[in-house]
Amino acid sequence: MFPIDIRPDKLTQEMLDYSRKLGQGMENLLNAEAIDTGVSPKQAVYSEDKLVLYRYDRPEGAPEAQPVPLLIVYALVNRPYMTDIQEDRSTIKGLLATGQDVYLIDWGYPDQADRALTLDDYINGYIDRCVDYLREAHGVDKVNLLGICQGGAFSLMYSALHPDKVRNLVTMVTPVDFKTPDNLLSAWVQNVDIDLAVDTMGNIPGELLNWTFLSLKPFSLTGQKYVNMVDLLDDPDKVKNFLRMEKWIFDSPDQAGETFRQFIKDFYQNNGFLNGGVVLGGQEVDLKDITCPVLNIFALQDHLVPPDASRALKGLTSSPDYTELAFPGGHIGIYVSGKAQKEVTPAIGKWLNER
């Protein structure tokens, strides 16, 4: 007897279903319109070099905007439209719905003219000037910051160096301890000769970083998801959702060489938030200088920033008002999943409104 029970009728039906999905999928892919991302209306209010500062329009029916503006500081390594990927999966829309007056820094696409930019240029230069713009425009002394991933590390540095300008700080999937045992990216980076890489290439190509991130989970991120895509092909909406994510994953700006060199050395190799030694503009970054309320949000299934890498923030600041929020999802799901829309953004808005 054959060890596997194969029924010809069921096998035939499976093959027919597979062929139908492939055929319908080809039609859906050919007829797919341009993939839209960054769906919420916004206005450019300030620009400098490659940077553009956007203010999001308050939607009809939204509550009156809070007097203290919220500035989102995104990472350099990806594009910020992940926070506004589609109508029903938008961190931006969720924040607007809670009454936040939302601004976002779009870092743009650095080129060779930006090779010499340093962390000091980003933190004490670009971010500080955006904060000052908001302070003047809204007539307030302090703003709220929301830092995402690497942007969360930037926001921590900024809040430590400029505590007089930050009212509340929210960090999302932000690495603080860069050397937790389960941090695959950190383990990979430890033996990289970053000086050779930057001296050779100038800026670090975004494509190189893409494949580095994908290599951390090669089976699920480069193979299995495309096999699973067959099950989506006969649904035009699911195809568009899949393509939106693909667009974002592979839309990675090059990294300004000197900033990348310093960030890798100071944080991934020297674990600067825990060990010290990070100096910007002649001043050492000390998280104990952060005195404002802090909301630290992390994802329990995050393979890029493990939960313990974010949890390490507890006790490192001088804030008397520290709160953690653990989300049962991954690094991207914390922005785009249906569960995140119901739990994460409302929690951020409520936390800010209470302060």
Swiss-Prot record:
InterPro entries: AB_hydrolase_1 (IPR000073), AB_hydrolase_fold (IPR029058), PHA/PHB_synthase (IPR051321), PHA_synth_III_C (IPR010125). Its EC number is 2.3.1.-. Optimum pH is 7.8. Keywords: Acyltransferase, Cytoplasm, PHB biosynthesis, Transferase. GO terms for cellular component: polyhydroxyalkanoate granule. GO terms for biological process: poly-hydroxybutyrate biosynthetic process. GO terms for molecular function: acyltransferase activity. Residues 69-334 form the AB hydrolase-1 domain. The keyword Transferase applies. It is found in: Cytoplasm. It catalyses: (3R)-3-hydroxybutanoyl-CoA + [(3R)-hydroxybutanoate](n) = [(3R)-hydroxybutanoate](n+1) + CoA. It comes from the Bacteria. Pathway: Biopolymer metabolism; poly-(R)-3-hydroxybutanoate biosynthesis. The active site is at residue 149. Poly(3-hydroxyalkanoic acids) (PHA), of which PHB is among the most common compounds, has potential uses as a renewable, biodegradable thermoplastic. PHB serves as an intracellular energy reserve material when cells grow under conditions of nutrient limitation. Polymerizes D(-)-3-hydroxybutyryl-CoA to create polyhydroxybutyrate (PHB) which consists of thousands of hydroxybutyrate molecules linked end to end. This subunit has catalytic activity that is enhanced 100-fold by PhaE, the non-catalytic subunit. A large complex of PhaC and PhaE; the ratio of the subunits has been estimated to be from 1:1 to 4:1, with more PhaE than PhaC. Belongs to the PHA/PHB synthase family. Type III PhaC subfamily. This is Poly(3-hydroxyalkanoate) polymerase subunit PhaC. It comes from Allochromatium vinosum (strain ATCC 17899 / DSM 180 / NBRC 103801 / NCIMB 10441 / D). The gene is phaC.
